[in-house]
């Protein structure tokens, strides 16, 4: 066995050590590493969970990529211009590499009115191909109706925000009013369900109806819609797939003379994704601070251990041990201390994350954070990398302090107590 490793194990595992300073120093160093690692694991898991939860909510309302009329996309949705989305164009979009799903949609602005109040909303017409998974997971009352593109069933979904403002309930009848060049038109709808995503930007205005109704209210032809929403197979490949769509679809013209264009969800919601991007910077700051805390406590602990083991160092030097061997002994001991800290830190960090995941113990204000509880997400690769980086960095920064050993004079140190 390596002499340095053997000596380090004997010192580290010595339960009969009565030294008054080094043992507390070891405990403090271990605690510093453990707390630092636990905070790093919790920070990464919470930020990943938060980013992906908010991202999935935004994508749930607008998918990954939208293909529509150039004028509509340029106006950022404030004005609606139709574009032809017939079977031919749908097939073109479906066969672009990296596309997972394609669905049509049409917007129409209107008013929901009760006997006591009214509310301006944006009706989003969807067809039978609509992927309702996101809204289904957000339903709090009622059911999702079958949305058709060939006939109107006068059924809608509203958000909890709308329901609270207008005092609406599932299966209730409500009148909606639409204003166009021909005047005011009224429609009577049945509220089939109520959803809640806590994404205020959409919950305040988004109301779902069938594609046929939205298209007819806009006065468009049978193959005209606001556009198509495209889901990609891999979100990380979004820029690549977007470029393929640009090359295939953008600047082409439909048979009505309207020009096609496309936008990614990041271009449609730049503020939200910029805000989510800032969280990465926060994580790096936290990681740096926690590594600094762990490193400083380890340096302090190592110097205290060396100071109290000065007599032993002198004896080893007198017996012919080289400075390198003695330095490696204390570095190995530091590795054992760091290892114990990592074990404790993993137990604390992962334990708290599991507790939050299954109990939702820590609550948040959904009006501010868009989620009602702190979201967490495990990423074992990141957790392993954090452990490895902590071990390597903490060990590396101890190399310089360990050179204090070379300054110790064996003749004087053997008399040191």
Language model features: what each stretch is:
Residues 1-37:
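N-terminal Sec/SRP start-transfer signal
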Residues 16-27, 241-244, 248-295, 305-307:
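Peri-transmembrane interface segments
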Residues 51-86:
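Membrane-interface junction motifs in transport/secretion proteins
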Residues 82-223:
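A structural signal for hydrophobic secondary-structure junctions
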Residues 340-388, 399-403, 407:
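Short helix-loop junctions at transmembrane helix boundaries
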